[in-house]
């Protein structure tokens, strides 16, 4: 039996916003020379720091994305006054995601730098109703690349961190920004709409304890869990960014 893992809105704080490379810094810099300081760099720094008596003078972490929450709640789920709760709506921390429709079937999050495939209701490969096993979702991305969708051939299935940047915890069904649930209707194309199912979307991230499972993000309410790779879920491609 799977143990369900529910990640709170605070997980958004782990999302990296593109930062300037600090390759010149031998301790806190771009350790893996990816062009930005990433989680992988941070892990490398921590490993090297073990046993060192001196304090590391590392730059401050990048500002996290805001969760989107505008109301506070008690344990029973009732809306309460935010004063003194320490909840996201009270603190109002982070920066908002801002989106640009590129007019070619894609939409770019200017905050993270991620460019997302828009989804349609026209029966095409972009149709929001298409479902895939995990391997089929990867094959779908290969097809988009072979077709040079929107002029690019570097599309991929988003990892768990990238997929969670779509979430807006101020709403549900779907728990996303309105830019990802706009103008949907029978026959609409990626040039005229951007659709989403309030359901499970695959990520490329394999579950650590077993290669037979992978992580998904539930666009209904924002929780994250893993499931068998043979299950059929929805998919959306991404490129660039983090």
Located regions from the model:
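Intrinsically disordered, low-complexity regions enriched in serine, threonine, proline
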Residues: 1, 19, 233-236
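Sec/Tat signal peptide C-region and signal peptidase I cleavage site
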Residues: 17-23
């Amino acid at each position: 039996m799977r143990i369900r893992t529910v990640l709170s809105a605070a997980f958004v704080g782990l999302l990296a916003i593109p930062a300037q490379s600090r390759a010149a810094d031998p301790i806190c810099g771009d350790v893996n020379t990816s062009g930005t300081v990433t989680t992988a760099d941070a892990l490398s720094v921590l490993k090297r720091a073990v046993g060192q008596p001196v304090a590391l003078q590392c730059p401050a972490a990048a500002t996290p994305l805001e969760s989107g929450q505008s109301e506070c709640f008690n344990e029973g789920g009732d809306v309460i006054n935010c004063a003194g709760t320490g909840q996201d709506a009270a603190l109002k921390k982070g920066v908002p995601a801002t989106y640009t429709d590129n007019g070619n079937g894609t939409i770019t999050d200017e905050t993270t730098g991620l460019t997302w495939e828009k989804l349609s209701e026209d029966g095409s490969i972009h149709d929001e109703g298409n479902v895939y096993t995990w391997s089929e979702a990867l094959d779908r991305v290969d097809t988009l690349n072979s077709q040079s969708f929107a002029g690019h051939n570097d599309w991929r299935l988003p990892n768990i961190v990238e997929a969670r940047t779509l979430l807006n915890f101020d709403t549900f069904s779907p728990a996303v920004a309105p830019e990802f649930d706009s103008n949907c209707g029978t026959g609409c194309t990626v040039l005229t709409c951007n659709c989403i199912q309030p359901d499970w979307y695959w990520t490329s991230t394999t579950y650590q304890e077993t290669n037979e499972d992978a992580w998904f993000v539930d666009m209904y309410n924002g929780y994250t869990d893993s499931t068998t790779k043979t299950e059929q879920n929805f998919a959306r491609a991404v490129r660039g960014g983090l």
